[in-house]
Amino acid sequence: MRHYELVLLVHPDQSDQVVGMVERYIKLVQDNNGTIHRLEDWGRRQLAYPINKIHKAHYVLFNIETDGETLAELEELFRYNDAIIRSLVMRRDDAVTEESQLAKNADEKRARKATTRRPDRDDSDDNDHSED
């Protein structure tokens, strides 16, 4: 079995169906003795250029280990699913299990937002001198 990295771009109007689609694809891989090494839902993101007048898409990343027949079946499902506007399949030499750079950046951004404190609204006058 070989290792593959799959990226799906799902139509933004179908974002609520992403979970069901992902579960169906995971089940297909696992039923054919494959393994899911990494699954990341990157959410809705701006496209670099419009695809069929669509400017945003919901991104999903998979790293799987499967055989050629299962991969061909997955690609066929991607091709005939109208909700998927683009798909990319890359063969990898090894299983990739670590978090992607995009996910790491998102985690760091969330951590920074959580640690930054909003200024107190009572202290908005910028005058720290007491005038008596």
From Swiss-Prot:
InterPro entries reported in the protein's UniProt record: Ribosomal_bS6, Ribosomal_bS6_CS, Ribosomal_bS6_sf, Ribosomal_S6_plastid/chlpt, Transl_elong_EF1B/ribsomal_bS6
Role, per record: Binds together with bS18 to 16S ribosomal RNA.
GO biological process, alphabetically ordered: translation
Protein name: Small ribosomal subunit protein bS6
Record Pfam families: Ribosomal_S6
Stated family: Belongs to the bacterial ribosomal protein bS6 family.
Any GO MF annotation of the entry: structural constituent of ribosome
GO cellular component terms listed in the entry, alphabetical order: cytosolic small ribosomal subunit
SUPFAM superfamilies: Ribosomal protein S6 (SSF54995)
Annotated stretches, region: Disordered: 94-132
Keywords of this entry: Ribonucleoprotein, Ribosomal protein, RNA-binding, rRNA-binding
Acidic residues composition bias: residue spans: 122-132
